[in-house]
Amino acid sequence: MRSHHLRAAAGDSAIDLAAAHYTSPYITVYKFSSGFVSKYSDPSTLPTNNGIGVDFSPDGTHIAVAHVSSPYVTAYPWTKGSGFGTKYSDPSTLPGGNCLGIAFNPDGTVLALAQYINYSMSAYKWTSSGFGTKYADPQTLPHSGHSITFSPDGTLVALGSVYSPYITVYPFNFNTGFGTKYSDPSTLPAGGGRGVAFSPDGSDL
């Protein structure tokens, strides 16, 4: 298994650790305390195919998986100590293709996805009951999104993509969604953007 096909995310207080992976059940979560303690039971309804990305909501009450094959994203309630709840309904408007990256915004009200084909990113309002309305796609889209993240204050969203310019950044507003794409960096990354992250204070990318 290549490392970029195993994605992990820590839950509340780093007590739960999730990995999205190839091969059923596609998502695996462990209790973690000074090392691996035990594996949680798999969800009763699995993602439909290979898991590529995973993220917990900031409050640790939801977990979402980006994966291959429709519906491309699957999300569940999460309870520390007991694990997966019943799968949320799929979004009414699905992402355009296989999703490789996934991220909640810092306050847990938006869920963003990096897509490899048919557009490169999608974002949805997120509520306590699951997926809300899909935001309009940004006007300028790079090709083949691979990773996605929000700035610590939630006002920026950055996409790593396989093809030039390899990294793209947009303003983001909860009410209006994506703003106009920022200019590309004067010196581009040397190749495909497989991962992307802001520094803790949001001043570096």
What is the predicted role of each segment?
Residues M1-D12:
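Enriched but not universal
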Residues Y22, V68, Y116, V162:
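Short loop/turn segments immediately following the C-termini of beta-strands
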Residues N50, N98, S144, G192:
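Beta-rich catalytic cores
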Residues G11-S13, P58-D59, P106-D107, P152-D153, ...:
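Residue-level detector of Asp-centered blade-edge/turn motifs that repeat once per structural unit
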Residues V29-V37, A75-F84, A123-G132, V169-F178:
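Short loop/turn segments immediately following beta-strands, especially the blade-tip
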Residues S38-T45, T86-T93, T133-T140, T180-T187:
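A short beta-strand motif characteristic of beta-propeller blades
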